[in-house]
Amino acid sequence: MNINIKNLVHAFSKLPSLGPSSSRRLVIHLLQNKEKVMLPLASSIKELADLIIECKVCGNLDTQSPCSICTNPKRDTKLMCVVEELGDLWAFEKGSIYSGMYHVLGGRLSAINGIGPEKLNLDNIPKRVTEFKIEEVIIAINPTLEGQVTVQYIIESLKNLDVKVSRLACGIPMGGEIDYLDEGTLKAALTSRQEYESNIK
């Protein structure tokens, strides 16, 4: 196999859900459809790579900072949903089921993987609550063991602030991923969200 083609296959294989076989099929499709698929795709990727930046307010990825969500006057600025990754934010947005603000952590705490609070967008949460006078923080963290540790860290960081802290209602299985949920399930979990009993007064 040509080294350039081999490198492209290897690059695709690093993407989520793509193994060597799937990557080879994708590359073959691109090579066989150079004008219609390969060149437009390469152009779009290059353009986005040059423009994409992280929102200095919420951690979203956009072509502007603050991002298009943070600057949208129709969003409810008193409501903030904390999510792990960009994919979780997109899951809420695709169904138009949420109209508040977001806070993207960029992952979850993991002692095994060496991910501490300093590597995540955690310390800005209480700062945003205070600065923007947020009234409710919705914690939409994936229900894993590491996710639970992350949730406890967030709750502890907000304990001295006058803010309601809630979580998505039951329905998301342990170990489940928010960005894989269908819109109906996610909407129900959000609508029926519950305030943490040990709230931070």
From Swiss-Prot:
Molecular function via GO: DNA binding; zinc ion binding
First and last residues of each zinc finger (C4-type): 55-70
GO biological process: DNA recombination; DNA repair
A Pfam short name: RecR_C
Keyword Membrane applies: no
Repeat recorded as keyword: no
InterPro entries: DNA_Rcmb_RecR, Rcmb_RecR, Rcmb_RecR_Znf, TOPRIM_dom, TOPRIM_RecR
Keywords: DNA damage, DNA recombination, DNA repair, Metal-binding, Zinc, Zinc-finger
Start and end residues of each Toprim domain: 78-173
NCBIfam families noted in UniProt: recR
HAMAP family: RecR (MF_00017)
Entry similarity comment: Belongs to the RecR family.
Function (record text): May play a role in DNA repair. It seems to be involved in an RecBC-independent recombinational process of DNA repair. It may act with RecF and RecO.
Protein name (database record): Recombination protein RecR
Organism in which the protein naturally occurs: Wolbachia sp. subsp. Brugia malayi (strain TRS)
Organism placement in taxonomy: Bacteria, Pseudomonadati, Pseudomonadota, Alphaproteobacteria, Rickettsiales
